[in-house]
Amino acid sequence: MSWRSESIWIEFRTGSRKTSNFFWAFILFLGSLGFLLVGTSSYLGRNVISLFPSQQIIFFPQGIVMSFYGIAGLFISCYLWCTILWNVGSGYDLFDRKEGIVRIFRWGFPGKSRRIFLRFLMKDIQSIRIEVKEGISARRVLYMEIRGQGAIPLIRTDENFTTREIEQKAAELAYFLRVPIEVF
């Protein structure tokens, strides 16, 4: 989603609150909870959950391994739910031609650097760079090349844009900022 006028362009970034993250966090939670319950059932020697007969699973080694996988899965699921709750990676890119300033803001993990805020002058922007790697794991990234700071990614690699959409976005942004486009 974006908002645009003659002198200001704002691009909003979604972050980690995406449908796929909700889906995987939920599936991982249920799967790891199932593993932990089966491991606990094999330890106790009775069915905690009636779907799986635990008498067929011996605690050592199968029950221990299933309990370990269940605990590990719960930790990973907790991590995913925390990133969704904190909305890590969301923010905005603001390009202001009137003031000649670019502001990039992203939410990070809680702590000292929770708010990631970059600010620099438009005259320091050297180019807009497109990096395209085709193949099995295709990767299309849009960067902004800044004098003295290197390349700053503007579009995340997990956003599934086609090559045409990336080129269109790069062309619009380069036209707005009045800088050249580089393709790698």
From Swiss-Prot:
Main location: plastid
Transmembrane feature ranges: 22-42, 57-77
Keyword Repressor part of the UniProt annotation: no
GO BP term (any one): photosynthesis
This protein's GO CC annotations: chloroplast thylakoid membrane; photosystem I
Entry membrane topology: Multi-pass membrane protein
Keywords annotated in UniProt: Chloroplast, Membrane, Photosynthesis, Plastid, Thylakoid, Transmembrane, Transmembrane helix
Compartments where found: Plastid, Chloroplast thylakoid membrane
Protein's UniProt keywords contain Transmembrane: yes
Job of this protein: Seems to be required for the assembly of the photosystem I complex.
UniProt record similarity statement: Belongs to the Ycf4 family.
UniProt cross-references to PANTHER family, sorted A to Z: PHOTOSYSTEM I ASSEMBLY PROTEIN YCF4 (PTHR33288:SF4), PTHR33288
Protein name: Photosystem I assembly protein Ycf4
Gene encoding the protein: ycf4
